[in-house]
């Protein structure tokens, strides 16, 4: 199998203690010669544990604290990049939109239908932070409703116009489960959503199956990558696993879209066929690639790709180190 080889451009030592990489992004242009900037949504470890966006560039790390009002018990903040700026969706109702030096965001309200009895998002929808990528003004966002485990089984599209300072929800859907070979006919549970992407007016979703139990304890039932409609209709399956529980061995893979042609696949277990190593899947060629990390950084994980740039990080009971890498080539 071919492999994507990475070389280190810059390593970032963290002066503060952060919990986890919730989601990431890149600002345009994403190339070393023009001052690449990457985004990382995380959270401070010390109380009150505010969410923070780290802006990574050749000059170092700029920390943007989102404030205690983003600590919503029901809704996670959602990070999305938009050209040279980025937004953070707060509690389904507004966008904090950052441009320039990112010191003072514009607050743009989000419309949810035009009348109280014709809301696009139901009141019981809960926003989830899972990574989203878009090349246009429609931003796909993950949601959960009715039963809340911090997962996502629903999605919505956010129509965003920063020039007019307008935003509105356009749909709220689940992915049709019957389209997947190993769906569970015994339940009504919709497929879980790991990540969403819109590129060239096409909507893509990666699902990690339907299991309601702990996947870390019992494993996944299946996973799949699909091109879907805004209503959740599966238009094309690009990748679909076998029934993972049939062999009696725990297995599972999570998927994360990037600002490139590649989907990052991360196995749940170190004793599976992939030996716990991440792989890439090309949306264009439908081929797998291994990943060769820079020397001395084999324990790091890949979180995003844009052009020839890659964002990696080391997690060990907290976020320990971040690196910006360049793609050396495919070997």
Locations of the language-model features?
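Short beta-strand elements that form the blades of beta-propeller/WD-repeat-like
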Residues: 35-43, 79-90, 96, 137-149, ...
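A short helix->beta-strand "capping" segment at the edge of beta-propeller domains
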Residues: 1-20
């Amino acid at each position: 199998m071919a492999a994507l080889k990475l070389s280190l451009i810059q390593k970032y030592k963290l002066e503060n203690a952060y919990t986890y990489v919730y989601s990431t992004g890149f600002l345009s242009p994403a190339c070393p010669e023009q001052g690449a900037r990457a985004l990382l949504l995380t959270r401070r470890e010390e109380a009150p544990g505010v969410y923070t966006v780290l802006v990574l560039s050749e000059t170092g790390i700029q920390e943007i604290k989102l404030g205690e009002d983003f600590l919503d018990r029901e809704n996670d903040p959602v990070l999305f990049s938009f050209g040279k700026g980025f937004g953070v969706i707060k509690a389904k109702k507004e966008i904090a939109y950052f441009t320039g030096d990112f010191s003072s965001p514009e607050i743009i309200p989000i419309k949810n239908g035009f009348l109280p009895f014709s809301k696009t998002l139901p009141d019981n929808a809960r926003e989830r932070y899972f990574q989203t990528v878009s090349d246009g003004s429609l931003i796909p966002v993950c949601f959960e409703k009715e039963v809340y485990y911090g997962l996502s089984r629903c999605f919505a599209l956010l129509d965003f116009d920063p020039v007019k300072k307008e935003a509105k929800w356009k749909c709220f859907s689940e992915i049709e489960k019957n389209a997947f070979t190993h769906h569970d006919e015994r339940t009504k549970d919709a497929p879980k959503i790991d990540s969403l992407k819109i590129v060239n007016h096409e909507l893509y979703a990666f699902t990690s199956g339907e299991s309601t139990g702990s996947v870390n304890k019992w494993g996944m039932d299946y996973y799949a990558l699909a091109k879907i409609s805004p209503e959740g209709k599966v238009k094309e399956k690009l990748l679909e696993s076998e029934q993972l529980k049939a062999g009696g061995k725990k297995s599972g893979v999570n998927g994360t879209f990037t600002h490139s042609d590649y989907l990052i696949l991360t196995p749940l277990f170190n004793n599976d066929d992939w030996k716990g190593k991440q792989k890439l899947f090309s949306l264009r060629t439908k081929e797998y690639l291994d990943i060769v990390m820079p020397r001395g950084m084999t324990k790091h994980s890949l979180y995003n790709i844009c052009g020839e740039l890659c964002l990696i990080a080391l997690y060990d009971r907290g976020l320990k180190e971040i690196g910006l890498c360049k793609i050396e080539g495919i070997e």
